[in-house]
Regions:
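Residue in the alpha/beta-hydrolase core beta-strand immediately N-terminal to the catalytic nucleophile
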Residues: 70, 93-96
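Active-site nucleophile loop of the alpha/beta-hydrolase fold
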Residues: 18, 43-46, 96-105
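Flexible "cap/lid" loop of the alpha/beta hydrolase fold
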Residues: 51-54, 90, 97-110
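Active-site signature of alpha/beta-hydrolase-fold catalytic machinery across serine-
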Residues: 83-87
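Gly/Ala-rich beta-loop-alpha elbow adjacent to hydrolase catalytic centers
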Residues: 71-82
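Short helix-terminating capping/connector loops at secondary-structure junctions
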Residues: 9, 90-91
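Active-site catalytic motif of lipid deacylating hydrolases and related acyltransferases
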Residues: 2-3, 7-67
């Protein structure tokens, strides 16, 4: 039987949404509600991503954490984590990347 773990078990997790900040019914938001100790990256503008600004938002969130986190990223958040990992020496427990967009695709923002 598969059971859902509703405790944090000491896991530090950081939710990294994509464009729109994963609204109320989104799986990232539901997971955050189930795990009140988890944190979420904050961005100034969730609808117009600017790589340098979003990297600063991720840096700020990482600075608040007590241990290397599981980075739970969705969509544009996956690309943010990839860019951040190239330039950061901070450790992470694991990346959990879901539905990374194709930057060469027609739906990708300019």
């Amino acid at each position: 039987m598969l059971r859902h773990n509703t405790t944090n078990d000491g896991v530090v997790a950081l939710i990294v949404p994509g464009i729109g900040n994963s609204g109320p019914g989104h799986w990232q938001t539901l997971w955050e509600e189930r795990h009140p100790g988890w944190q979420r990256v904050q961005q100034r503008d969730w609808d117009r991503p600017v790589c340098a600004e979003w990297l600063r938002g991720l840096d700020a969130a990482m600075a608040r954490l007590s241990a290397p986190p599981v980075l739970i990223a969705h969509s544009m958040g996956c690309l943010l984590v990839a860019h951040w990992a190239k330039r950061s020496s901070l450790p992470v427990r694991a990346p959990f990347l879901v539905a990374a967009p194709d930057p060469a695709g027609p739906m990708f923002p300019p």
